[in-house]
């Protein structure tokens, strides 16, 4: 999935036209019976650590007498065979949860209530847990049924649940009566899409026909079984890798390179400067970059390699660089580096060829100066909590090349 792809009725990518799909999840829910911020951060950190690691574990499919497992039991055996054919262990168990299994790489079950700690099982990083029940996505107190947040608390990379009773009205002897509707829940092939290398969001939305009542929570980009390209950025002028801290000037060409195991190939490359795509090329081609049109000073250079597969797995390398064309410099100093929310931070600028400057962080302007030499004080409570990165840009005119970026400084706000 990419934001600009159009799709046909049979799931084929169209040259033009067709609906576009922008995949999304909730990173976490803190309201009601949701998770604490610490639990959400821990789960997201664990999920990010799983990317491309091909975890050694087993995906478990639970079956029991409950209609919640019978509703989608038909395709389970075929899904298990396909997962095993992809080189990942899968197993069908009787019960509600796997008991005493320390290698749970994924879970499909169906039950109104469960107690994960009592199972004695352990989730490996990157696991998707899916429980078919009516109110898994309802977090209000006393709603009944165990919410999906129990899986996030246990370390799942993602889970889902419906936010209302997922009934559909079906004809029944001449009268409409409610019945559970399996297409409102993920098909068991959710886990198959995942082990074939799709990211979490791609796996979920390929597996659900009617997701309008379904809340998906977790890391949308987690991709434990993806084969991720290792990327190198080479300066064509001297055939040397562009290393962190490198200084670049003038018009240059970059040679993107990617290596993959098992004979894989990356056939497309994209170049980003500070998160903005500025060039793209094919296999064996170069990425042009006119650094004279950019601000002097600090920039993040990113090259993304895209594999020649249906999933189009991406790998990337991000390199902080310095651009030096116009003689402008700017340094940013922040003290102290660790501060309590009730305290103040001192932010100092020292620039050459700078007429004014802006200090910003967390997407907000925090201060402005009329010169390139200045010190301002900021209440730490304005910066949020945890690691906070501050940046500064100086200017001598209206054009991008009339600016200079200071190297960013990261501080920690907390008790």
Language-model segments: residues:
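Cysteine-dependent hydrolase recognition
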Residues: 1-251, 309
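Short, solvent-exposed loop/turn segments at the edges of extracellular beta-sandwich modules
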Residues: 306-312, 395-402
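Short beta-strand elements bearing conserved aromatic residues within extracellular beta-rich modules
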Residues: 269-271, 357-359
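Short proline/glycine-enriched turn/loop motifs at strand-loop junctions of beta-rich domains
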Residues: 262-266, 350-355
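Surface-exposed, short loops/turns at beta-strand junctions within beta-sandwich domains
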Residues: 291-297, 380-387
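Short beta-strand segments within Ig-like beta-sandwich modules, predominantly Fibronectin type-III
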Residues: 277-284, 366-372
